[in-house]
Amino acid sequence: MLRTTFLRTPRQLMRKSPRASFSIVTRAAFPHLKNNQDEAEKKEQGLFDSNKKRLDTLEHGKNPDYKQPGMEDLKKKGDDARIEQNRPDDGVY
């Protein structure tokens, strides 16, 4: 009885599990959206999808024109953000 409970390989798990119809591959094919979203959720989901697409292109895309900003540019950008958000510089980074 314990032998059938503790399966050793994913193939055995797929065959013997009652959840085999909902394997990882099958669940990945399901859409990640809710069926009935209100306007706020649709707006937030659209923002999430656009940010995810942008992140994927930044991480995996090949852009030969991209030049990493220098330390001075990054420091200036951080100082401008701190001033814009009206936060004191706490010195913790």
From Swiss-Prot:
Annotated region (Disordered), positions in chain: 30-93
GO CC field: mitochondrion
Compositional bias (Basic and acidic residues): 35-93
Transit peptide feature, positions: 1-25
Record key words, sorted: Mitochondrion, Transit peptide
Compartments in which it is found: Mitochondrion
Major location (coarse): mitochondrion
The keyword Transport is assigned to this record: no
Leader peptide range in chain numbering: none
Transmembrane segments: none
Record's note on what induces expression: Induced under aerobic conditions and by mild heat stress.
Domain of life where this protein originates: Eukaryota
Miscellaneous note of the record: Present with 937 molecules/cell in log phase SD medium.
Name under which the protein is recorded: Protein FMP16, mitochondrial
Species annotation: Saccharomyces cerevisiae (strain ATCC 204508 / S288c) (Baker's yeast)
